[in-house]
């Protein structure tokens, strides 16, 4: 049944992309990327990931002038993550930059919006990134500016110039990093869009030549009573198929796309009881008010009920297996998950992601 589902969606996507040509050949080695936060309570198993993005570093922009950047949280946590390379020398670790500010010695002084507006500040930031990579033996940089032309976390934004300047920033980063370092970004499920005051989001077509791959955040695409990370959903605001189709129509190679996997249930976006980590889900299964691992056949996703009402959707080993076959059938570059510490003590979802990426689907 899974194979029939995957093949049918594959045909639908292929048809929708005409006249863009045939699907790219599958890369031999797919990426299994874990986001690991500075505040997390566990480390990834370096033997069941290929890449780790350490989250986060933040910009220090004072009165619209870029000064430097620093890691969020304690450096000791970052050192622990970097030490994982001793257990797996092939492991790639990148530093992810956020638009938010959390360090006590910092404040919002313009952020990415102001820094990227200046050619001199862009180049200084790029040079600082290269120096940091060399100092720590990092493998690359990931930009998680969410999002150009928008502000929902108190950060500065300028819809008139942010999207254009984002492209210039990625260009300068690639020129500084060269081809020896990874450059990626956290991608929204849609391309740039026009607004009354300018544009929002990333100009994907303009940015893709500069990056090695895109971490497409195919989660939080809706909330209860709809599905947040469905492969296909006729009721959700967006779904995985729509996201991949959006990128493919812009000419993004399939092997540059990583599919995002949430390690949590999305209930709402109201700032109250918004998410439930997978490790909490495991504990809540003994609560008689909850029902977990219910299955929607169209969306190919599990969901939960609370007192017989739809509570939220999430991913589990079953849905990750379906997405794994889908990733291989389409020739995507792999997957990413947010985030490592939300998994249970047995690392159930991390192991499922590794199985989804490494399984031989040709047998």
Please identify what each model-predicted range represents.
Residues 1-5:
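Positively charged n-region of N-terminal signal peptides that target proteins for export
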Residues 8-19:
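Bacterial N-terminal signal peptides
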Residues 25-133, 232:
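Glycan-recognition patch characteristic of GH18 chitinases/ENGases
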Residues 29-30, 89-93, 137-139, 179-181, ...:
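Short, well-ordered coil/turn segments that N-cap beta-strands
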Residues 33, 60-76, 148-288:
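Substrate-binding surface in catalytic domains of secreted glycosidases
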Residues 45-48, 77-81, 108-111, 121, ...:
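Stable alpha-helical elements in mature extracytoplasmic
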Residues 52, 95, 143, 173, ...:
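Conserved, mostly hydrophobic/aromatic
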Residues 96-99, 103-110, 256-326, 346, ...:
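Glycan-binding loop/region signatures in secreted carbohydrate-active enzymes
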């Amino acid at each position: 049944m899974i194979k029939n589902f995957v093949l049918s969606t594959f045909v639908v996507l292929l048809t929708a992309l005409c006249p863009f040509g045939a699907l790219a050949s599958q890369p031999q080695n797919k990426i299994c990327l874990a986001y690991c936060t500075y505040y997390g309570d566990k480390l990834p198993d370096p033997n069941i990931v290929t890449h780790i993005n350490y989250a986060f570093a933040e910009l220090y922009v004072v009165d619209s002038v870029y000064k430097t950047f620093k890691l969020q949280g304690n450096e000791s946590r970052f050192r622990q993550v970097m030490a994982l390379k001793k257990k797996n020398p092939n492991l790639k670790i990148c530093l992810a930059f956020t638009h938010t500010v959390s360090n006590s010695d910092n404040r919002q002084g313009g952020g990415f919006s102001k820094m990227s507006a200046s050619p001199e500040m862009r180049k200084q930031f790029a040079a600082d990134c290269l120096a940091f990579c060399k100092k720590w033996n990092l493998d690359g940089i990931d930009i998680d500016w969410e999002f150009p032309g928008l502000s929902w976390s108190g950060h500065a934004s300028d819809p008139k110039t942010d999207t254009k300047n984002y492209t210039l920033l990625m260009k300068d980063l690639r020129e500084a990093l060269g081809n020896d370092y990874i450059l990626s970004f956290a991608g929204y499920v849609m391309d740039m869009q026009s607004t009354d005051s300018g544009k929002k989001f990333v100009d994907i077509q303009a940015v893709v030549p500069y990056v090695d791959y895109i971490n497409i955040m195919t989660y939080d695409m809706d909330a209860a009573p709809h599905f947040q990370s469905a492969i296909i959903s006729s009721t959700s605001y967006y779904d995985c198929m729509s996201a991949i189709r959006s990128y493919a129509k812009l000419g993004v190679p399939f092997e540059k796309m990583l599919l995002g996997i949430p390690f949590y249930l999305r209930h709402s976006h109201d700032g109250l009881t918004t998410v439930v980590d997978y490790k909490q889900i495991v504990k809540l299964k003994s609560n008689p008010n909850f029902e977990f691992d219910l299955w929607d056949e169209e969306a190919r996703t599990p969901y939960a009920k609370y007192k017989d009402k739809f509570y939220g959707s999430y991913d589990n080993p079953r849905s990750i297996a379906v997405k794994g076959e889908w990733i291989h059938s389409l020739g995507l570059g792999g997957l990413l998950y947010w985030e490592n510490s939300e998994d249970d003590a047995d690392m159930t979802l991390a192991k499922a992601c590794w199985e989804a990426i490494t399984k031989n689907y040709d047998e």
